[in-house]
Regions:
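Histidine/acidic-residue-rich, glycine-tolerant segments that coordinate divalent metal ions
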Residues: 51-52, 71-73, 79-89, 96, ...
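Acidic/His- and Gly-rich active-site-bordering loop/insert found
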Residues: 1-90, 95, 99, 103-115
């Protein structure tokens, strides 16, 4: 079987069995098994999910990183390898990232004796929940690493092409939560209440001025309001 065929099969297996952030136990076992079969060394970091492998010898170390978690989304695609886990799917392509990194590991293993140093391969959990990188850092996975490289699939590019540039490329993410307290009233007598819906709607619009007025126009920033809901009544 060719490397391409192997990676396609692995990607489809991962796609069929997606796991949410910090729940990627079966995914980790699959990756571990595939790496063991290729005689790739796995480093003994204490991680609940995710793993770190290493190829090569020497003092110099660089790292390659891929994310492995999925999203809480129901898959609607009608393909033979669609998700078998209700309400969970690899909607962001982390099955692709993991397969690509496995392919890199296999190719690097074939050239291990010619490498001028070590390549540390990070399979990061919990990218979607914004905490997985910290678990690797706290475990010591980046000790002595001089540089780290990652990638993300880009459906807008033609197959077989990749893009890069100097400077920042992909973003760091921060979350914010706002709570707006109002006072209920009859729809025909809004003056007797405090309309939280109106205020929230205005706030969403005003927040967009942060990107256009508070940030240097030469810097890249995106501010999105992803969800608006009312408190559940007990």
């Amino acid at each position: 079987m060719t490397l391409s065929s192997t990676l396609i099969n692995w990607r489809r297996e991962l796609h069929q069995h997606p796991e949410l952030s910090l729940q990627e136990e079966a995914t980790t076992r699959r990756i571990q098994g595939w790496l063991h079969a290729a005689d790739v060394d796995i480093l003994p970091f204490e991680l609940k999910t995710g793993l770190v492998a290493e190829i090569g010898k020497g003092e110099d170390v660089i790292a390659l990183r891929a994310d492995i978690d999925a999203l809480p989304i129901e898959e609607s695609a009608d393909v033979p390898f669609r998700s078998l886990t209700p309400g969970v799917m690899h909607a962001c392509g982390h099955d692709v990232h993991t397969s690509v990194m496995l392919g890199a590991a296999l190719l690097l293993k074939q050239q291990e004796t010619t490498l001028p140093g070590r390549v540390r391969i990070l399979f990061q959990p919990a990218e979607e929940s914004f905490g997985g990188a910290k678990t690797l850092i706290r475990a010591g996975a980046l000790q002595n690493v001089a540089a780290i490289f990652g990638m993300h699939n880009e459906p807008g590019l033609p197959v077989g092409e990749f893009a890069t540039r100097g400077g920042a490329f992909y973003a760091n993410v921060d979350r914010f939560v706002l709570r707006i307290n109002g006072k209920g009233a009859h729809a025909a007598r809004p003056h007797e209440g405090k309309d939280a819906i109106l205020l929230a709607s205005q706030l969403v619009t005003v927040l967009q001025s942060v990107a256009s007025r508070d940030v240097n126009t030469l810097d890249s920033v995106v501010l999105s309001v992803d969800r608006k809901s009312t408190r559940l009544n007990s």
